[in-house]
Structures are given as C-alpha cells and as structure tokens.
C-alpha cells in the first residue's frame, strides 16, 4: 500500500454512491426548519447519503456549529461560539419524534467558553428526547468538557443509553491531531463515566491513516479496555480540506477486518471497523449489541 502523502490517490473502496431521494431532501428540510445542525453536514461525513436517504438516521449537533477547538482532522468551524439556545433541546426532541427514530445520537461542538462545557444543555436534551420519545434509545457523544468531573456527572445523571467519547487517534499522535485535548484525559473521562453509571455502555472511536502503527492501534485498544470501554469503532481518516492533516495511508478493507477481529478478542462487546466507518455509523445496531451483552452477563 502506497503511503506517499503527496501522491496518495483515494482507492476504489472509498468511492461513495450519492443518493438524494425524498428521505434525504425531507430530512434536510426538517433540520433547516427547526434551526438544527447535524455533524453529518458540518463534519462532511462520507456516510450522509446512506444515513439520510436509506437508513433515515442523523446525528444531531447541539450547542451551535462553531467549536472552540481547532483539531487538525475536523471540518467543523472554529471560532467564538454563539450564545446558548435553551430552546434547542425541545427542537431536537420534536425532530426525533417527527422522524420516528428508534435510536438517536446527540453530539456537540466543544464549548470551552462555558464553565460547564455545555453539560446542562446536553443533559436537558437527553431529558427532552426521553419525555417526547420514551422508547427511543439515546447515545451522547460529548467533548471531554474540560475534564471536569462535575460536568460529566451532570450529563450522566440524565441517563443516556450510551456514552460515547472518542480518543480519535493513538497516544503518540494525539498532540499533533488534537492539540487542545489529551489522550489521558479522554481515557479518564471514559473511566469516570463508567464509574458514575456502571450499567451504561461506553464507546470510543479511532481514526487510522494518520501515520500510526498497527502496534499503536492495538495499544489504544488495550488502553480503552483497561478503562472499561465496551464498544469500539475504527474508520479511515479522510482529509476534509487542504488545510487539514494529510492522509498518510489508506487501509485496505482486509486490514479493517483484521482490526475488528483483534478488538473483539480484546473483549469489546461490539466493533465496527471499515473504510467509511464513523463514530455514529450503524449506531442503532451497536446499542442492540450492547444490550444483548448486558443480558448475557446478568
């Protein structure tokens, strides 16, 4: 596999089939009418057409669409965020109802400008969804909220069905990939989430193709399992713009299959691994797998 940064060409298995049927256009219209953001759009997710047009799922992004951090892999805008919108939780909940979602993922930009990192709005969004959609399972994907224990507790007290927090890359590359976060703080965040609510599954994600080694990926798996993480997703890093980090390597689908086998052998209850896998990819299937694993342990 060629790894020359300047001459890497996107392989055939990363070619995406675009689908803009009425599900896609209807979902986009619903988001605009309710003044809502999705990470699908803001982060230029390659699966947006499959999720919106075929699966009719979306990942809501709350707390605005401007992030206080400038991670070098991420396409979300960076700058000074807008004021908090306390009506946003109700609008998200109503959109979930209109979409008739069985599983919903809620993520957010990092809000280092807020003392609680946005935890109060995040928690209220979970509660609002629960009130209007009592049978919908809820997955939350927050930033590290500054590593403040009280902020995490506020969110976990709202009782989401899955707590997802991404380490994004291996230990060695973290300072280069996401300079305003730390590898250890993310692991601590995941460990404390499990300590606060032991029955709530935790989840994390790793991007590959940034220059990591196979041994470093396996080390990251071990670190996640040591901190009681249940679910893992592994996907190919794709450069959003020329200003972002370049792709060092495109992994072959066979390599992803091998990584999945290794992850499952480490004790993860579920692992999604593939070129186009993202943190929220087939999230509805992951919550079902986590539920089945809990029942087996009971």
Curated annotation (Swiss-Prot):
Signal peptide: none annotated. NCBIfam families: lipA, PRK05481.1, PRK12928.1. This is Lipoyl synthase. The keyword Iron-sulfur applies. PANTHER family: LIPOYL SYNTHASE, LIPOYL SYNTHASE, MITOCHONDRIAL. It is an enzyme of class 2 (transferase). [4Fe-4S] cluster 2 binds at residues 67, 71, 74. Belongs to the radical SAM superfamily. Lipoyl synthase family. Keywords: 4Fe-4S, Cytoplasm, Iron, Iron-sulfur, Metal-binding, S-adenosyl-L-methionine, Transferase. Its EC number is 2.8.1.8. [4Fe-4S] cluster 1 binds at residues 40, 45, 51, 280. Pathway: Protein modification; protein lipoylation via endogenous pathway; protein N(6)-(lipoyl)lysine from octanoyl-[acyl-carrier-protein]. It catalyses: [[Fe-S] cluster scaffold protein carrying a second [4Fe-4S](2+) cluster] + N(6)-octanoyl-L-lysyl-[protein] + 2 oxidized [2Fe-2S]-[ferredoxin] + 2 S-adenosyl-L-methionine + 4 H(+) = [[Fe-S] cluster scaffold protein] + N(6)-[(R)-dihydrolipoyl]-L-lysyl-[protein] + 4 Fe(3+) + 2 hydrogen sulfide + 2 5'-deoxyadenosine + 2 L-methionine + 2 reduced [2Fe-2S]-[ferredoxin]. GO terms for molecular function: 4 iron, 4 sulfur cluster binding; lipoate synthase activity; metal ion binding. It comes from Geobacillus sp. (strain WCH70).
């Amino acid at each position: 596999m060629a790894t020359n940064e300047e001459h890497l060409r996107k392989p055939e298995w990363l070619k995406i089939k675009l689908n803009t049927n009425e599900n896609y256009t209807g979902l986009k219209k619903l988001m605009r009418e309710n003044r809502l953001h999705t990470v699908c759009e803001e982060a230029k997710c390659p699966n947006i057409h499959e999720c919106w047009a075929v699966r009719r799922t979306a990942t809501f992004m709350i707390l605005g669409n401007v992030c206080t951090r400038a991670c070098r892999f991420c396409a979300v805008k960076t700058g000074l965020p807008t004021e908090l919108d306390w009506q946003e939780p109700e609008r998200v909940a109503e959109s979930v109802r209109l979409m008739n979602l069985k599983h919903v993922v809620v993520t957010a930009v990092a809000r280092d400008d807020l003392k609680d990192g946005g935890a109060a709005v995040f928690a209220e969004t979970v509660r609002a969804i629960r009130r209007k959609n009592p049978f919908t399972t809820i997955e939350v994907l927050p930033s590290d909220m500054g590593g403040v224990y009280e902020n995490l507790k506020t969110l976990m007290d709202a009782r989401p069905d899955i707590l997802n927090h991404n380490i994004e890359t291996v230990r060695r590359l973290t300072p280069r990939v996401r300079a305003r976060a730390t590898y250890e703080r993310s692991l601590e965040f995941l460990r404390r989430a499990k300590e606060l609510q032991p029955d709530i599954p935790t989840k994390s994600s790793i991007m590959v193709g940034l220059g990591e080694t196979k041994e470093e990926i396996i080390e990251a798996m071990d670190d996640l399992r040591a901190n009681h993480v249940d679910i893992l997703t592994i996907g190919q890093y794709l450069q959003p713009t020329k200003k972002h980090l370049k792709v060092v390597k495109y992994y072959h689908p066979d390599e992803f299959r091998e990584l999945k086998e290794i992850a499952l052998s480490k004790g993860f209850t579920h692992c999604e691994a593939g070129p186009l896998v993202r943190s929220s990819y087939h999230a509805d299937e992951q919550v079902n797998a986590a539920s089945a694993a809990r029942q087996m342990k009971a």
